[in-house]
């Protein structure tokens, strides 16, 4: 799941306010649409910048039930709400889109033995990500640090 690390969102937790999302609401949602993915692509760079500036964390985990889940702080949830999202939906799309990119890039190598934190991705979601792959990759690529 190197892609999650490319998102710049993985790492050890720094704050005790970070909590796992509810497994009943995070990945037990309908597949995302192309419109939702495009909005996610538009909002992700600002969220990544906010995460970095505020030293927050948001990343996939395996919950107590052994299922893929997502860990994010109340502050991150508040930022996402202010951007017009339901946090559970934003982080669901984040996890599924990252998993779809991993499937596209690694194919059978990852689908035969997926990492335990990797959520299931529907065929429709995989197709939507394929159609929007250049924009998604641009949104998740690390921003180069300006040289002084």
Positions of predicted regions on the chain:
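Bacterial N-terminal signal peptides that target proteins for export
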Residues: 1-8
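Compact alpha-helical subdomains of small soluble proteins
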Residues: 62-147
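Hydrophobic helical h-region of N-terminal Sec-dependent signal peptides
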Residues: 9-14
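Immediate post-signal-peptide N-terminus of mature secreted/exported proteins
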Residues: 23-64, 135-148
């Amino acid at each position: 799941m190197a892609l999650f690390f490319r998102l710049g969102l993985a790492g050890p937790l720094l704050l005790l306010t970070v909590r796992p999302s509810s497994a009943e609401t995070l990945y037990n949602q309908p597949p995302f649409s192309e419109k939702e993915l495009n909005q996610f692509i538009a909002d992700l760079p600002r969220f990544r910048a906010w995460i970095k500036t505020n030293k927050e964390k948001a990343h996939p985990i395996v919950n107590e039930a052994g299922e893929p889940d997502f860990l994010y702080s109340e502050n991150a949830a508040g930022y996402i709400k202010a951007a017009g999202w339901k946090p559970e939906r934003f982080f669901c799309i984040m996890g599924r889109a990252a998993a779809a990119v991993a499937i596209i890039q690694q194919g059978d190598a990852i689908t035969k033995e997926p990492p335990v934190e990797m959520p299931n991705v529907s065929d429709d979601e995989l197709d939507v990500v394929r159609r929007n792959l250049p924009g998604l990759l641009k949104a998740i690529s690390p921003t180069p640090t300006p040289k002084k």
